[in-house]
UniProtKB/Swiss-Prot annotation:
It comes from Hazara virus (isolate JC280). Residues 722-776 form a propeptide. It comes from the Viruses. This is Envelopment polyprotein. InterPro entries: Gc_C_bunya (IPR048791), Gn_nairovirus (IPR048801), GP38_nairovirus (IPR048529), Hanta_Gc_N (IPR002532). Disulfide bonds join C901-C1096, C929-C934. Glycans are attached at N97, N346, N639, N1081, N1299. Residues 1-20 form the signal peptide.
Length: 1421
């Protein structure tokens, strides 16, 4: 019974293995080792051996069953002996000979004698399948039993020296928290890795002898040479082996844990938290600890779960993600380096001194590293809400990601990177132009605001009054200032004159008061016995009283009579006042004298002259013509004369959203296909995709004579094909990039090629295929808002010549380009009946600018109708081939010492990288450099090493070599609203529309290109998570280090040549072969001019020092950014996305220079174009239908459907214009037909403000003599919606513009003045009712101005009752005067009684003003 029970157990084990991770028998079974082995299932045989091996590793129970031993021995002879397996297991983990491999029972054999087993069912974490196939079942083993499956690598494949002698831990118990979180963890034996925040947590266990128990956790346990997953509750089992009678275990390991979603509670890690106890020796502490449980709470699921959602959890959304973390490894003789070190000895003490196994210790080194993460396939969705959300005082974009990731926003040269946790609000970047959003995984969105920037001051206020000023002049603010100055300018001038005058007067009086305050008073006169008031009075007494002369009246008196006369002299008061007045004048500086004198004499003249000057300046500025940059160089035959300039991109940029030729009219079966496909893309439901395919097959079959090409809604979901958290042999592989913005633009125009024609909202192609492609346009703003976030549109129409002339996107008043039509000269003009047949050619050059173009007028003086041919450039980009050179950054380097008491130093001082610098000093032991236990003198060795501790602090930089490949241009040619062809011009293209043939050359004369070497830079400030894809800036690389040629400390002295080096020490995602790949260990570091040395400290090992080493070179990169050219300011990059593949980085580099992008040569060849001549008389020209809908002051504008009837001829080309000045309509051609039931014409209009009625008239109505005005003019009532604050997905817009330019200076000024007068007349007519009333009302302020001019001084005398500046207090200041001049004046003063002569009348007036006795300003002027 026992035997049968044992066989039942084996059969159960076999049944379990059939469902486990295993290889097929034919693929993995080795050759039998006995001549006649029993017939045993190879899978069962493998499980028997594996269980015995796991038992030898201490990871499973030993199946000590005699019958099992008998079966195993019958298969492998004595190979199943437990002791033999333990010996072979030790060799498996110890022997580092790379030529040694191992068979099924771990017998060591040369690799040449063993063939790796092919495995198609299992790939261990961290290893690429191609690498697995090379070593599977020879150096890579999968040991599995009923309880666990363990993957191990032999030391011949991986030798990280992680096994250490096992010691029983002696811990002194202490108190501590029973439960704690990882972020509050402070234990010597446990380290939480600060990595990218997610559902997984990484914990490094530094002392494996301390038991760890898991509960409700999903854990991956990485022991460097082995790893296994643990899902059940229980202790962590550490791999071990027996060698020389001692047990060896992994010293440190890494746990990557997350909450088991099927469990009831959080994940709990129960262990002993060890802390430093009492100090036994200097720097050596005993172990002290307490039982604790680390609690990890999982993220609670909110909302419902879709059936189609994947069970796999994912932690990141981009394959180029790098999260900062850490790693821990046991230090051996060949794997030391910089970083924090901690040493455990004999299971009882802990220290930071590096000690090895010879001391019964092992040292663990903590390393700064980055971890890579790969998203699940098809789960990296990125969407942007069309409607803006309030965030504080601003509006923000709402971005949705499937998981947390980095989102880059850019607008012009303003680039920002934001960390987004599934849903986040991002402020709209400052600047002008479209908003580009780069999502994780490479998805791109181009957005623009729906609210159109009508740069007319206060256009939506004052009842639209300001729009008239914007119509009068290209500079509406100047025009507004002109009219304000005309009405109130003179009053403003007068008020300004008063203010200036009284300011000068107040300053003068303040100066006089301050000087008087500190002026020395006069002395007592001994002759006349009178107190002198001032120093000037003192001088007068000295000069007069000495000669017995009265100082005031000048009479000579006896000495006694002088004393009686002077106090009662009748002229004393008058003379003192005169002296005081003169002194006031002298105390004021000369500049103030001049200013006051000028204000008194020329005040009125200055006021009037100022008013006239300002008026003339404002008037000339208001009517001055604007000057743009001409960007065309027409090349025409000598017998042709044309005027050719380009169209203004500002206007085109305006209508990149306003204008489009087609709007949705019918939502038929094809629309059903688009809607179903759109729904399927949003849900990723195979059922929905199949349903949409069925609809397409049933509705678009062979019955349709033409296939329809439909523009697809582009909702791009980032799809990565790698497994989550898996490091490959070429581990850093992000997968392929999705299509970018430029590829989407190309698809839009290539889907509607020149073999197709536009019919309503579709581009129809005549090959009968069932595949369709639809042009998605607006059908009302509400329907647009629901689709904007996930669709791109090709909008096609002519632009609108706005009568107010003030729509702004980049520059309103000074357009970047001048614009005009080319009047094509004809080689032949033939008249046949009522038709004119034209033939001719024209050649011109269009400089490459975004959203610009050129228009030809196809008409003749003898023709009554005219067609307009538009060749427009939607966009263009320069395509570059980029080659990766190296990765660098502002690295931090650190040193470490190693020493031995006897023997040699470790090879390369224990450094295992190619970037370290080391130096050794043999036989360096002496009493000053020895620890207390080392008595050696002249023995041993000392070495120092220095290496990279942290590769990036503030900057992550990549250097590239670029090569210009080509320039792709998106060109569209349009003749009417139903004849429009688009294509991507690479090697020249030809467009044929009826009798018109347009040939566009290759891009030529490209002047601005990217430098041959560039740097992509990412700033890591405040965010230690790196997404290599998101380069924040691109700069030139003139001052960056060349490849492996650099001085130490310069930008680029560290050069990472293999991308796997970035994750070399990451061990939280399975096995990592990156640190073994010889190509990985190829980082280059410049140590030019650097040297190492050491210094001794008695009683301890020596310490290292260095000279010439820059420990951190952040300042070098700061200086680099200040000196290099910022290419983001000179280029608009459609794509600068970076991906990782094949151990290097790749960059999809496409950009458009802001200027100097080149030019296109355009040949227009017209053969037999038929137009109606002026001999024809139109009959029955009238509107049949007209309808408009949309919003006002928004970029989507109004969509109008119109049908024009005519009785004779059968067809005629007409144009529409708006009667209302607040409505502008496109200038495109419309075909008037006699027959009914034809396609309706569609056009775009724009309303600057809300209106209730729209009126259009036919421009060619003058050719219809019998037509009534009500037939050729149509008015309809409309209900316009206000603009919604939404973002529109980027649109390729075909644009058109007609605006004649002047050819001479006089003509420019004349036309500008005429436009000004016309604008004034429009204001009078539309705002005041009539031009006559406007003139009358305008004359009133003019008359008031003339009244002020002629009688201003008289009018101001009415205000003479107002007085000011009287009774000012006087101060005293001492002033030195010329004595001789003063004596002469005083002598004359004694006789005449005046210090101011007749020629000093202005001085007396100023003195009176300063004393407060003069006239006021109004009386003076």
């Amino acid at each position: 019974m026992e035997g049968s029970y044992w066989w039942l157990s084996l059969l159960a084990l076999l049944a379990w293995g059939a469902n486990g991770e295993s290889t097929s028998p034919a693929e993995t079974s080795p050759a039998p080792t006995t001549p006649n082995p029993p017939v045993v299932n190879p899978s069962l045989r493998r499980k028997i051996v594996n269980q015995r091996i796991l038992s030898a590793m201490g990871m499973d129970s030993d199946p000590s069953n005699e019958a099992l031993n008998g079966v195993c021995q019958s298969i492998h002879s004595n190979g199943c002996n437990a002791n033999e397996l333990k010996l072979r297991l030790a060799d498996f983990f110890i022997d580092t000979n790379s030529s040694q491999c191992y068979d099924e029972i771990l017998v060591k054999k040369p690799c040449s004698s063993l063939t790796p087993a092919h495995n198609s069912h299992w790939v261990p974490r961290g290893l690429d399948k191609s690498e697995v196939d090379k070593i599977f079942d020879t150096k890579l083993k999968l040991f599995f039993s009923q309880s666990r499956k363990v993957t191990c690598l032999s030391a011949s494949a991986l030798n990280p020296s992680q096994f250490v002698k096992h010691f029983q831990v002696k811990i002194q118990e202490t108190s501590g928290p029973a439960k704690q979180s990882l972020r509050s963890l402070h234990c010597v034996n446990l380290v939480w890795s600060h990595s990218h925040k997610g559902e997984k947590e990484v914990v490094h266990v530094l002392q494996s002898a301390v038991p760890v128990k898991l509960k409700n956790c999903l854990a991956m346990l990485n022991f460097r040479q082995c790893y296994y997953n643990q899902q059940s509750e229980g202790p962590v089992v550490v791999p071990s082996y027996q060698h020389n009678g001692e047990k060896w275990v992994t010293g440190a390991y890494t746990m990557t844990v997350e909450v088991d979603k099927h469990a009831d509670g959080p994940c709990e890690i129960s262990t002993t938290c060890i802390t430093e106890g009492s100090e036994i020796k200097p720097g050596v502490h005993s172990l002290r600890g307490f039982k604790t449980t680390l609690v990890i709470h999982g993220k609670r699921n909110t909302g419902r779960r879709l059936l189609s959602s994947s069970n796999a959890r994912q932690e990141c959304s981009s394959g180029t993600f790098l999260g900062e973390g850490g790693s821990a490894q046991v230090v051996g003789p060949k794997n030391d380096g910089p970083g924090d070190h901690i040493t455990f000895c004999n299971g009882s003490v802990v220290t930071k001194i590096r000690l090895g196994q010879e001391h019964g210790c092992y040292t663990v080194r903590r390393i700064k590293t980055y971890r890579n993460c790969r998203p699940e396939e098809g789960s990296s969705a990125c969407e942007v809400d069309d409607e803006l959300k309030p965030c504080g005082a601003q509006k923000c974009m709402n971005v949705h990601l499937s998981v947390k990731g980095l989102v880059k926003t850019s607008r012009g040269s303003n680039v920002q990177v934001h960390s987004c946790d599934k849903d986040c609000l991002i402020q709209i970047p400052e600047g002008f132009g479209d908003i580009q959003i780069d999502c994780p995984g490479g998805t791109q969105h181009y957005l623009e605001s729906n609210v159109l920037d009508v740069d007319c001051p206060m256009y939506n206020r004052l009842g639209g009054l300001m729009l008239y000023f914007c119509r009068m002049s290209h500079r509406p603010r100047t025009c507004l200032a002109l009219f304000i100055w005309l009405g109130a300018g003179y009053g403003i001038t007068c008020i300004a004159g008063y203010m200036v005058y009284y300011a000068i007067l107040a300053l003068s009086m303040l100066t006089r008061c301050l000087k008087r305050k500190y002026m020395v008073k006069g002395d007592f006169c001994l002759k006349c016995e009178q107190k002198c008031v001032t120093s000037l009075d003192q001088t007068l007494h000295d000069e007069s009283c000495s000669y017995n002369i009265c100082p005031y009246c000048g009479n000579r008196l006896p000495e006694e009579g002088l004393r009686r006369h002077v106090p009662s002299c009748p002229k004393r008061k008058q003379r003192l006042e005169e002296i005081d007045l003169y002194l006031d004048y002298l105390l004021v500086p000369c500049p103030l004298h001049f200013a006051l004198s000028t204000a008194v004499k020329l005040g009125t003249l200055l006021k009037r002259l100022s008013w006239v000057t300002v008026f003339l300046c404002l008037f000339l500025t208001a009517i001055a013509p604007v000057q743009g940059q001409v960007t065309t160089s027409p090349v025409l035959p000598s017998n042709q004369s044309t005027e050719c300039t380009l169209l203004p991109p500002p206007v085109f940029l305006i209508f990149s959203a306003v204008l489009m030729s087609k709007t949705l009219k019918r939502m038929g079966p094809v629309n059903k296909v688009g809607a179903a496909g759109h729904s399927a893309r949003r849900t990723n439901s195979p059922k929905n995709l199949y349903k949409s395919k069925q609809i397409a097959n049933t509705k678009s079959g062979p019955r349709e004579p033409r296939r329809r090409v439909v523009v697809k809604a582009l909702l791009i979901l980032t799809a990565s094909s790698a497994l989550q958290s898996i490091h490959l042999a070429q581990a850093f592989d992000s997968g392929s990039l999705p299509e970018g913005a430029w590829e989407e633009e190309m698809q839009l125009v290539q889907g509607c090629n020149q073999e197709c024609s536009l019919e309503e909202d579709e581009c129809s192609c005549p090959d009968g295929q069932s595949m369709t492609r639809k042009l998605l346009f607006f059908k009302g703003l509400n329907s647009a808002a629901s689709k904007m976030a996930s669709s791109h549109r090709l909008l096609t129409s002519v632009s609108i010549d706005t009568p107010w002339g003030a729509i702004k996107v980049e520059s309103t008043y000074k357009p970047r380009l001048a614009s005009s039509n080319i009047q094509l000269a004809w080689n032949s003009i033939e008249e046949q009946g009522d038709k004119v047949i034209l033939s001719g050619k024209s050649t011109s050059i269009i400089k490459l600018e975004e959203k610009t173009g050129m228009q030809w007028s196809l008409g003749s003086e003898s023709a009554a109708e005219e067609k307009r041919l538009l060749v427009s450039i939607l966009d263009y980009t320069q395509v570059y081939s980029s080659t990766f050179q190296y990765i660098t950054g502002d690295r931090t380097v650190s040193e470490w010492p190693k020493a031995t008491c006897t023997g040699d130093c470790p090879d390369r001082c224990g450094c295992s990288t190619s970037s370290c610098l080391y130096k050794s000093w043999p036989h360096s032991r002496n009493w000053r450099c020895n620890p207390t236990w080392c008595w050696g003198v002249g023995t041993g060795c000392t070495c120092c090493g220095v290496d990279i501790l942290r590769p990036f602090n503030k900057y992550f930089v990549t250097k590239w070599t670029t090569e210009y490949v080509r320039t792709d241009v998106l060109v569209c040619v349009e003749l009417t609203d139903q004849e429009r062809h688009c294509d991507v011009v690479e090697a020249g293209s030809q467009f044929v529309i009826g009798p018109v043939r347009v040939v566009v050359s290759d891009p030529q004369n490209v002047q601005t290109k990217l430098p041959s070497e560039i740097l992509t830079i990412q700033k890591l400030e405040g965010n230690q998570v790196v997404d290599i894809m998101h380069a924040t800036s691109i700069v030139s690389a003139k001052n960056a280090c060349k490849l492996q040629s650099c001085t130490h400390g310069s930008p680029g002295d560290m050069q990472i040549l293999h991308t796997d080096n970035l994750i070399q020490h990451s061990h939280d995602g399975g096995l990592n072969l990156a640190d073994l790949n010889p190509l990985v260990n190829s980082t280059w570091m410049s140590w030019e001019g650097c040297d190492l040395d050491y210094y001794c400290t008695t009683g301890s090992w020596p310490s290292c020092t260095y000279t010439g080493i820059n420990s951190e070179n952040t300042e070098s990169f700061d200086n680099l950014l200040n000196t290099e050219s910022n290419l983001c300011e000179r280029f608009h990059f459609h794509s600068k996305r970076i991906s990782a593949s094949g151990s290097t980085l790749q960059m999809d580099l496409k950009g458009r220079p802001n200027s100097g992008g080149g030019e296109l040569s355009v040949l227009v060849d017209v053969k037999g174009l038929e137009l109606h001549s002026k001999k024809i008389s139109l009959k029955g020209l009238s509107f049949k239908t007209l309808s408009c809908s949309g919003c006002y002051a928004c970029s989507s504008g109004l969509s109008c459907t119109v049908e024009v009837r005519i009785e004779r001829p059968d067809e005629f080309t007409v144009h529409l214009r708006s009667v209302s000045p607040d409505i502008a309509v496109a200038e495109g051609s419309i075909i008037a037909r006699r027959m009914t039931g034809g396609p309706l014409s569609r056009l775009r209009a724009f309303a600057v403000r809300k209106v209730k009625k729209i009126c259009f008239e036919i421009v060619e109505k003058s050719y219809c003599k019998d037509c009534k005005n009500e037939d050729t003019t149509k008015c309809i009532e409309v209900e316009l919606q206000p603009p919604k604050d939404i973002l529109l997905e980027h649109k390729g817009t075909i644009i058109k513009r007609q605006n004649e330019t002047c050819v001479s200076g006089l003509q420019c000024w004349t036309e500008s003045a005429s436009s000004f007068v016309s604008g004034v007349g429009s204001f009078f007519r539309n705002y005041l009712g009539s031009i006559t009333l406007g003139i009358v009302l305008t004359l009133l302020p003019v008359a008031v101005v003339l009244l002020f001019f002629c009688y201003g001084d008289k009018l101001f005398k009415l205000c003479s009752c107002f007085r000011c500046c009287r009774g000012l207090s006087r101060g005293k200041v001492r002033k030195e005067l010329d004595e001789d001049e003063l004596r002469n004046k005083l002598k004359k003063f004694s006789k005449e009684g005046e210090l101011f002569g007749k020629e000093k009348k202005d001085a007396r007036t100023i003195a009176l003003l300063l004393s407060g006795k003069g006239k006021n300003y109004k009386e003076l002027v």
